[in-house]
Amino acid sequence: VDLKDFKQIELSHFTDTKSINYLRDDASHLLYLESSALEVFRDYKDHDALTVRADLNIKDVKTKIIDNHKDFALVISAEDKVVGTIALHYIESQALQERARSSGTKPADLVTHDIMLPIAKVNTVSYSIIKNTKIGHILNTLINSDYHHIVVYDKNENGEKYIRGYFSLPYIRRKLGLDVYHVYQKEGVSNLNKGI
């Protein structure tokens, strides 16, 4: 094939235009299930951990989480030790309303300690494991677990564990542009589809 076999493209100009928008290089920031899990990891080395006191009123906790554009917070004791976690989706859930009613308490009277997930029940994974995993591994784990978050721990130079960050199902959904439905035990099925 010779170059003269290709027809020339008719060119034009931006007439009467002083400025114009351009396509930014967002393609390099696209994430896929095969992308590194670190792309959606909420690393406390890069982002401050959001903490709430165990005795804080639930309404104030919700406000603090929303005002900080988060969906998850660490619950701390008076001694600044992490005693649990709390997620926005649970604060807003019907399950919380039913739990309050069944205990004879108004939801507005609940404090963080009443509804937090105790630290001993939190799903955790070592940073050394997740640093080589893919987003798909984390997403599959989250949609098939009881909770929407996974706390990631690391070890300091003395070999002591500390909370390094977390993975969040709502955050991953937003970053990937996915509609993901959490597994409910009675259904036993998860649904993952790409919203286009």
Tell me what each language-model feature is.
Residues 1-196:
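Tandem CBS (Cystathionine beta-synthase) repeat/Bateman regulatory domains
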